[in-house]
Amino acid sequence: MSEKQIVLIAGDGIGEEITNSARAVVDAAFAKAGVTANWIEKKAGGAAIDAFGEPLPQDTIDACQAADAVLLGAVGGPKWDDVDPSIRPEKAILGLRKALGLFCNLRPVKIYPALREFSPLKPELVENVDFVIVRELTGGIYFGEREEAQGEGPNEFAWDKETYARYEVERIMDVAVETARKRSGKVVSVDKANVLASSRLWRKIAKEKAEANPDINMDYYYVDNTAMQLVTNPGQFDVLVTTNLFGDILSDEGAVISGSLGLLPSASIGTGTSLYEPIHGSAPDIAGQGIANPLGTILSAAMMCRYSLDLPTVADSIEQAVTAVLDVGYRTGDMYREGFKKVNTQGMTDAVIAHLG
């Protein structure tokens, strides 16, 4: 029986509740597949500040680097608003990205038929929406040189510099190609090559990757057109690959299209151990009440099984169980409507486990 080494970082707020839920689902799915998990619990974020005076202890970094995967709940909250900016809880995420070499964020956007009514778009527009945004994480304008505001009056100015090196673009394109190869084989590379020099390099390399991978259908969109297409015809997309800045914006647009942030998972992958987490925050207002929606974390765990643990059938089983639970009408409070079955965190967890294939 194979044993997977998984670091579990509950984090802050509802983090403990939702990671416990995902852990229970993974253990149940593993048991059916003849796999075991060694869960290694570590602290990061506000919980680590409270315990150790820093958001990301070296002990947590060491454990993550040695593990097969990392599953994270959420970090941050108003409790730590007044701490020194250098040790804010969110610094834990940036530190993990650096320590683990995480250069790529995968953000799936899927409309579940049972939840189509939650999307702000018309039902006919979101039918069959199921795409992945592949976002570059460590380059671009967020990490470039900058100058804060200086000067006075109408001549006051500030600037930010975007730089992309060939290797940064090549490796994110490789992830997009491999992701598409496991799906429909369609990739849209998103840039602003009609204006930005960095985008012209981006598009040049994207075209080279398309030529080197003839089984992949690569198209090229400007970011402004992509933003429009996401709300007028989102079903056309399968894999979108883009820069750090554009990916940040388009990922949030995609999340809104889904209509339920509580369901959306994400993965950050790179040269070392990969990190999996739901896209929602720590929700301190409902922490400890047992009513948080655990599905985003459960689906993040499914991504972990698929991308890091080489357990695609386990990932399928978890994802299919979530779909089945939604189809039969189970809803946590954030998704509840009259006529459905309202459940708390534990109730949703039990329902998913009961529907595992």
Predicted regions and their residues:
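Extreme N-terminal starter segment of soluble prokaryotic enzymes
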Residues: 2-6
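Glycine-rich phosphate/diphosphate-binding loop of Rossmann-like nucleotide-binding domains
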Residues: 7-24, 29-30, 153-224, 236
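Buried hydrophobic positions in well-ordered alpha/beta secondary-structure cores of metabolic enzymes
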Residues: 12-15, 68, 134, 176, ...
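N-terminal beta-loop-helix "entrance" segment that forms/cooperates
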Residues: 34-58, 228-230
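Glycine-rich phosphate/nucleotide-binding loop
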Residues: 46-49, 230-330
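N-terminal glycine-rich phosphate/adenylate-binding segment common to multiple enzyme folds
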Residues: 50-159, 245
